[in-house]
Each structure stands twice: as structure tokens, then as C-alpha cells.
Amino acid sequence: MADDWESAADSDVVIRPTAAASVNKWEGEDEDEDIKDSWEDEEEKKDEEKPTKTEAPAKPKPNKALKAKLEQQALREEEAEAERLANLSPAEKLAEKLRLQKIQEASDLKHAQEAFGVTSTCGGLDAFNPETKEEFKEFGATLSWKVAQFRESEHFPQFVEDLVRSLCVNLSAADIKKVKMNVEVLHSEKLKLEKANAKKPAGKGKGKVTLRTENDDIDGYQKYGNDFTEDYDDFM
């Protein structure tokens, strides 16, 4: 009986080959997708961390209201300046006129230098370095013309007196005597003219008697070169 059981057991036992582990060819793709997603997230973070360029805001165009306001302000400033000038005394008006004239001359000189391509600021009287008689004549005419521009000022007579005195300091006694004689001659001529003008009644078409000096020829001298009259040598 026991032998029957053993033979039955032996006949029932079936040895089957072990099934090979199934290999999934798609296995691991989910991991790759996770890695790819993680890499994309890193790139997105880097893009977010990059500073974004901010565009400069466009300048607003001035509107009509602002333009009108600026024009009104400029008009008020002009009116205030006109009122200020109207309240000036005669002496202050003259000083203001000379100041504006000086500014205009400086502006004209600058424009002339730019037009002719002159870069050196040395010009006018500073450009002179006289050595000959003709050069001193030209220098004297230019200096006299420059000084005469301020003859309307109330301080001009005192200025001339101080200037002559300071110049004569550098002369000898004999040269100062010559200057004195020339000034006395000019003084005598001036007295005669002033008396003649005081006695002559003012009439239509009759001009005032004037004394011709070297200053009368300066403008022509400046325009046409060295064709200056000999009055300058006779006087000085």
C-alpha cells in the first residue's frame, strides 16, 4: 500500500521549467519622463531667475496746455524785465546799455571766430605787438576806438584823466611837455567851438560846429586798412 502511494506520488510530480522573468521593454520610461520633467523644471527656474529687461518709458510729449503755460511764463518774465528797466535811473540805464552792448560784442566776436574757424581766444588789442611807427599808429587807432565806445558814461572823463596820467608816468619830462602842449591846443580849440555853438542860434538846416579828431576817421581806418589821416601824428 505504501508502495502504491509512493508510486502515485512519483507519477503526479511534474517538474516544470521555471518561467523566465518577464522583461517589460517599456520599463524605465516613466523614470526617464520624470528626469526629463525635472530638467525642464530646472530650465524654467533658470529662465525665471534671469533679469528681465525693462523698457524705458516713453517721454511724454508736451501737450498744448503745458506749451501755453510756458508761453505765459515767458511773457510775464518779459513784462517784469521791461518794468525793471523802466524804473532805472538814467545812470543805471546807461550802465545797463553798456552791459548789454558788451554782451552783444562778445557774442558777435564768438560767432565771427566760429565762422572763420578761429580757435584762439587772443584777438583785438591782445593781438597787437607793435614795433614800427605804422604798427603803433594802428594800435593807437584801435585803442582809441575801443575807449571811445564808453564816452557817453558819466565816468568817462575821470577815466581818461587817470589813463593819461598813468601813461605819462612812463614818459620823460620832455615827452610829457609835448603831450601837455597838444592837450592845451586841443583845449583851446574846444573852447572856441563851444563858444561858437553857444552864440549861434539854432536854425533849420544849420549843423553844429564840431572839432574833427582822429576818432572821426577810426571807422574808415578799421574798414579800409591803414589809410589813416596824419591828424593822429599831429595831435600826439
UniProtKB/Swiss-Prot annotation:
Q: What organism is recorded for this protein?
A: Drosophila sechellia
Q: What is the protein named? A: Eukaryotic translation initiation factor 3 subunit J
What does this gene product do? Component of the eukaryotic translation initiation factor 3 (eIF-3) complex, which is involved in protein synthesis of a specialized repertoire of mRNAs and, together with other initiation factors, stimulates binding of mRNA and methionyl-tRNAi to the 40S ribosome. The eIF-3 complex specifically targets and initiates translation of a subset of mRNAs involved in cell proliferation.
Cell wall biogenesis/degradation listed as a keyword = no
Q: Looking at the record's lineage, which domain of life comes first?
A: Eukaryota
- UniProt keyword annotations, A-Z: Coiled coil, Cytoplasm, Initiation factor, Protein biosynthesis
Q: Which PANTHER family match?
A: EUKARYOTIC TRANSLATION INITIATION FACTOR 3 SUBUNIT J
Instruction: Return the Pfam families for the record.
Output: eIF3_subunit
- Locate the region Disordered: 1-84
Q: Which GO terms describe its cellular component?
A: eukaryotic 43S preinitiation complex; eukaryotic 48S preinitiation complex; eukaryotic translation initiation factor 3 complex
Subcellular location field = Cytoplasm
Biological process terms from the Gene Ontology for this record are: formation of cytoplasmic translation initiation complex; regulation of translational initiation
Show the ranges annotated as biased composition (Acidic residues): 28-46
GO MF assignments: translation initiation factor activity
Read off the Gene3D superfamilies from this record.
Eukaryotic translation initiation factor 3 like domains (1.10.246.60)
Basic and acidic residues bias spans: 47-58, 68-77
Q: Which InterPro entries does this one have?
A: eIF3-like_dom_sf (IPR023194), eIF3j (IPR013906)
Q: Which family does it belong to?
A: Belongs to the eIF-3 subunit J family.
Subunit structure and binding partners: Component of the eukaryotic translation initiation factor 3 (eIF-3) complex. The eIF-3 complex interacts with pix.
Gene from which the chain derives? eIF3j
